[in-house]
């Protein structure tokens, strides 16, 4: 894929930083076989953007590593082109710098983004105080609903699947702007380790406890039925890491 790299991806870039508060994050996301690669590129960028925003920063620059499928050169070129078009469509909104890129072939295509940000809001896990409210910027459930989709759940209609994709295509920039305006903190990105694990980290750091009520309103399309039937790929690890810190008061509601 080296010849393809030369057309689309640079090897390196020089970035001039005027702030002394620099944030960096790296994130990888595996390709959803049913999704068009343009939207997947957008989702991969926004997935990484969440880490930067939750650190109280705005995106400055990024580098990408693209895992392309084992295919003929034209197919690889297709994925490379549309992955990057999706990524660039979101980076243009951020006015962020595309610094460098790399490609490789893989049985599990995916996108890794190393993203840099400039810190504009001091937010740390130990800043929660008693009486704080927990605000979710999006409904929960992408992990287990994607698992339900992959297992052909009869409860998961095309309309619900569209809601899942549309949720992933929404940036949290507007939510971050509100947090900045009202100096809300701490912030966290709950993708990956889930709401439970991230909230436990905040509570431990702030010497507090938190109370949650799971209801249909905070899950995409109210799909609680599939929650008991399907598990996300990270479910077991997340459960094992968090279960000793959680007290379930009523399992029926």
Show the residue positions of the predicted features.
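N-terminal short beta-loop-beta anion/metal-coordinating cradle
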Residues: 4-18
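Glycine-rich anion-binding loops of enzyme active sites
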Residues: 17-33, 58-156
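Alpha-helical scaffold segments that flank or form the walls of functional sites
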Residues: 38-55, 88
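Hydrophobic alpha-helical membrane-association signature
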Residues: 40-44, 79, 83, 167, ...
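Glycine-/charge-enriched secondary-structure boundary and capping motifs
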Residues: 71-97, 104-109, 181-187, 191-253
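Active-site glycine-rich loop that binds ribose-phosphate moieties when present
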Residues: 113-123, 156-180
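Glycine- and other small-residue-rich loops at beta-strand/loop junctions that grip anionic moieties
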Residues: 126, 137, 164-168, 188-191, ...
């Amino acid at each position: 894929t080296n010849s393809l790299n030369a057309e689309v991806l640079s090897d390196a870039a020089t970035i001039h930083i005027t702030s002394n508060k620099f944030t960096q994050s790296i994130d990888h996301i595996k390709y959803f076989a049913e999704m068009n690669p343009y939207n997947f590129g957008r989702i991969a960028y926004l997935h990484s953007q969440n880490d930067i925003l939750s650190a109280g920063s705005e995106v400055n620059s990024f580098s990408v590593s693209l895992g392309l499928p084992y295919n003929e050169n034209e197919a690889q070129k297709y994925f490379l082109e549309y992955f990057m078009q999706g990524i660039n469509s979101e980076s243009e909104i951020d006015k962020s710098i595309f610094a460098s890129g790399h490609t490789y072939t893989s049985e599990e295509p995916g996108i890794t983004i190393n993203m840099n940000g400039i810190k504009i809001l001091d937010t740390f896990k130990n800043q929660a105080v008693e009486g704080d409210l927990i605000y979710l910027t999006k409904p929960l459930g992408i992990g287990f609903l994607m698992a339900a989709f992959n297992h052909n759940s009869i409860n998961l209609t095309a309309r619900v699947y569209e809601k899942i994709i549309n949720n992933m295509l929404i940036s949290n920039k507007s939510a971050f702007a509100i947090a900045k305006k009202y100096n809300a903190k701490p912030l966290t990105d709950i993708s990956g380790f889930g709401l439970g694990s991230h909230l436990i980290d905040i509570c431990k750091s702030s010497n507090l406890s938190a109370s949650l009520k799971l209801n249909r309103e905070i899950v995409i399309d109210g799909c609680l039925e599939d929650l008991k039937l399907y598990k996300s790929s990270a479910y077991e690890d997340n459960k094992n890491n968090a279960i000793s810190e959680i007290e379930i008061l009523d399992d029926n509601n």
